[in-house]
Amino acid sequence: KNMITGAAQMDGAILVVSGADGPMPQTKEHILLAKQVGVPSIVVFLNKADQVDDEELLELVELEVQETLSEYEYPGEEIPIISGSALLALEALTENPELDSANNEWVQKIYHLMDSVDDYIPLPERDTDKPFLMAIEDVFSITGRGTVATGRVERGSVDVGETVELVGLKETKETIITGLEMFQKTLDKSVAGDNVGILLRGIQKEEIQRGMVLAKPGSITPHRCFKAQVYILKK
């Protein structure tokens, strides 16, 4: 469930495969789920390359990964595959946070990975012109401040101080946004594509559930009947 929720929001993904062990059964599951929920682009990182002495073994794992990706209709031969060691890169940077990547091959490979992400995964077009809409994924309370709803802004934009509607499951309510936060940074404005926490005035935690939405007042209407496309996954 959590894998699907996260993957459904992605503009791209890094598939991590052990260079020492090759693709595991769950690797295929993750690729299948990514394809089914519409993750458009994948970059591959072959981890634990430090544990593989024979370069040909890494090449065999790379070929196996390419075949697996192609099996699920990703362009396996075009997808960037970078080998490295996350552990050795982390240890090097922990020991010397100011380390120049050029002086450590494992750190350099992580930078190469991120460059590949920037180059291969296209910058997504955000739907910023339509009315604000965010599906609520989680909710929690901050003592002395109020209730926070978290989720990904699907479309539009929203500012601190703006009035929004809480819609779905229960009676529609209006509330005012008193705070926006993303990755522990306070924002004045949030736009489509942001994963944010929204602090709401006058709303109790019990009034919000996952599956409800925050929206510009009057922009959406809840329905009891709808058509949906469902993927049934089997083992």
From Swiss-Prot:
Localization: Plastid, Chloroplast
GO molecular function per UniProt: GTP binding; GTPase activity; translation elongation factor activity
GO terms for cellular component: chloroplast; mitochondrion
SUPFAM superfamilies (UniProt xref): P-loop containing nucleoside triphosphate hydrolases (SSF52540), Translation proteins (SSF50447)
Protein biosynthesis among keywords: yes
Major location (coarse): plastid
Superkingdom in the source lineage: Eukaryota
Record EC number: 3.6.5.3
Any one Pfam family match given in the protein's UniProt record, by short name: GTP_EFTU_D2
Cleavable signal peptide: none
Catalytic activity: GTP + H2O = GDP + phosphate + H(+)
Domain tr-type G: 1-125
Listed Gene3D superfamilies: P-loop containing nucleotide triphosphate hydrolases, Translation factors
Key words of the record: Chloroplast, Elongation factor, GTP-binding, Hydrolase, Nucleotide-binding, Plastid, Protein biosynthesis
Sites where the protein binds GTP: 47-50
UniProt similarity note: Belongs to the TRAFAC class translation factor GTPase superfamily. Classic translation factor GTPase family. EF-Tu/EF-1A subfamily.
Role summary: GTP hydrolase that promotes the GTP-dependent binding of aminoacyl-tRNA to the A-site of ribosomes during protein biosynthesis.
Full protein name: Elongation factor Tu, chloroplastic
